[in-house]
């Protein structure tokens, strides 16, 4: 699995417009994209726009990049500068519930961005920790959507 995370500063008063644009324009443009597993967007607690997508593999993500850029072009006027993009292969991931693209209740997303692994540890160690410790701990937590770890840098 492959994940892409985008963070962007949004011009004052444009956050709701940016989120609506993603919901009403970007997401529907992905209906026929092969290999897309999920896409979501939110406003962060520090006022930034955040969007993420998960893919079957990097090739599926790369095959859709032109369509992605075309769909996002309309949001440029709402942004205050260039977005920051992080992407990489998932080293571990677990989804607990599904969220419908038709809408309904929103959900809360929490991302923890780190700078790699601890000295002497590998991404295999991260995957093992997630699989053996984090996933079982969250298995019966009501309302949790998913957890994961992604390798974005060496």
Spans of model-derived segments:
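Short S/T/G/P-rich N-terminal loop/turn motif that feeds into the first structured element of a domain
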Residues: 1-50, 54-154
